[in-house]
Amino acid sequence: MKQLILVSFLIVFNTNAEDQTNIDALLDGLHEDAHKGNFEAYFDRYSLDAVFLGTDKTERWNIQEFKSYAKPAFADGHGWTYEVIERNWEGSGDTYWFDEILFNEKLGHCRGTGVVQLINNEWKIKHYALTMLIPNSIAADIGTQTQQAE
């Protein structure tokens, strides 16, 4: 019985470690493809029914809408660049969720959050949301500016 429990634990641990490696590769590749302007490779990382949320309140796109939005940014061989500072994720089986702190020269620190799912033995991004990180000390001022801009 102890051996069965140990074997079960090792299988789960190994699977989780392998999943984590594959998910990190998926997300690292996403950011690398965006940086290099690899449109097809970038969007191949998303599921066919993926949703992307951008930083503006109007930016809720299905994958086809997101492709239309992003195409001009990728047209010159450059997409956008976000450096990964830190990443956390949770989950098991065929679904994981993550959050990552990113840095962009224009927007500063941002947070990407999302859900990935194993589809036909390949990890795909089902949902991704990008938000700007605002220090609490200036949040009220930013809130006022946001309301004025609307």
Predicted segments, located by residue:
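Low-complexity, intrinsically disordered terminal/linker segments enriched in charged
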Residues: 127-150
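A mature extracytoplasmic/lumenal domain signature
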Residues: 46, 56, 86-88, 101-104, ...
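Short, well-ordered alpha-helical segments enriched in acidic and aromatic residues
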Residues: 37-49, 53
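Surface-exposed, charged secondary-structure patches
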Residues: 19-24, 67-109
